[in-house]
Regions:
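A short, conserved beta-strand element in the Rossmann-like catalytic core
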Residues: 128-131, 240
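Residue-level signal for inorganic ion chemistry
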Residues: 34, 111, 127, 166-168, ...
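Catalytic-core segments of class I nucleotidyltransferases/pyrophosphorylases
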Residues: 138-142, 169-242, 246-258
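N-proximal low-complexity "stem/linker" segments adjacent to membrane-targeting elements
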Residues: 1-5, 10-14, 18, 25
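Short catalytic helix/loop segments, enriched in acidic residues and glycine
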Residues: 20-35
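Conserved N-terminal catalytic core of the sugar/cofactor nucleotidyltransferase
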Residues: 2-5, 13, 31-124, 136
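Conserved donor-nucleotide/metal-binding helix-loop-beta segment in metal-dependent transferases, i.e.
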Residues: 133-161
């Protein structure tokens, strides 16, 4: 299994904080957000390579972070403790601003094509912070061999209005309806920026791009995907943080558990 962390956005909602630093490199509990994500992904035994796709503007900052993170990992290993040994590779999507961005789906497609990925795939958005382990949804994915999108039980219709909410079949976990920031959501289940794809379904990402669909947000892709294939969820109740606003960032700094 390969993993892609999408980190090529420009985070205009967090300006001026993110004017000179990308959102995934903002520190929470002593480490950049992206490092927490990499550590969570590295817990999955089948993941043998992690790609972090970023933009040309912030690529040098990610390079510096990766050099420092590798140095720390070596020091930890020398000290006798265990450290994730999954290789991490940076991918530059060549964009320099919101105006020429490829979009999240476009960035995933770029990595698949450029790196010749032909394996099961895990995608994690680079602004996701969560207290739960991905191992449970990974095990469900292995058993079902279907496209899987982990879900967060927010227990809040207000929170669902601000995100993509999902109605699922309670017995099978299959997606019945997905609503992007609906004014009257039918569910408090929130779609997370995390996706598992079986290898044989990767061609759907290429098909979506080739058909000139909106490459910007995964919500558009998810709605299209539900018309092509079964999509299932795995529900988590442990905390998840959408670090898209200053208030959410402050909450994450208090309540996130590495």
């Amino acid at each position: 299994m390969k993993a892609i962390v999408t980190a090529a956005g420009y985070a205009s909602r967090l300006w001026p904080l993110t004017k000179d630093i990308p959102k995934p490199l903002i520190e929470v509990k002593g480490k950049p957000i992206v490092e927490h994500i990499v550590n969570k992904v590295a817990e999955i035994p089948d993941v043998d390579e992690i790609f972090i796709v970023t933009n040309a503007k912030f690529y040098p900052l990610f390079e510096q972070w990766l050099i420092e993170a590798k140095a720390v990992a070596v020091a930890v290993a020398v000290g006798g403790a265990s450290a994730p040994s999954v290789p991490v590779k940076l991918v530059n999507d060549g964009t320099t601003s919101n105006d020429d961005r490829l979009g999240q789906v476009g960035d995933i497609h770029l990595v698949l094509e450029q790196e010749n990925v032909d394996d099961d795939l895990l995608v994690v958005a680079g602004d996701n912070l969560f207290n739960f382990s991905l191992l449970q949804s990974y095990e469900t994915f292995l058993q079902r061999q279907l496209i899987l999108n982990p879900l967060y039980e927010s227990k809040s219709y207000r929170a669902a209005r601000e995100s993509g909410s999902v109605v699922i079949d309670e017995e099978t976990g299959e997606f019945i309806e997905f609503m992007e920031k609906a004014q009257t959501p039918k569910s408090t289940l929130i779609s997370l920026g995390i996706y598992f794809f079986p290898q044989q379904k990767l061609q759907l990402i290429k098909k979506y791009i080739d058909e000139k669909n909106n490459p910007d947000k995964m919500g558009f892709f998810l709605m299209w995907l539900m018309q092509q294939e079964k999509v299932i969820g795995h529900v988590y109740t442990e905390k998840w943080f959408d670090v898209g606003w200053i208030e959410a960032l402050e909450t994450a700094r208090k309540e996130f558990t590495p």
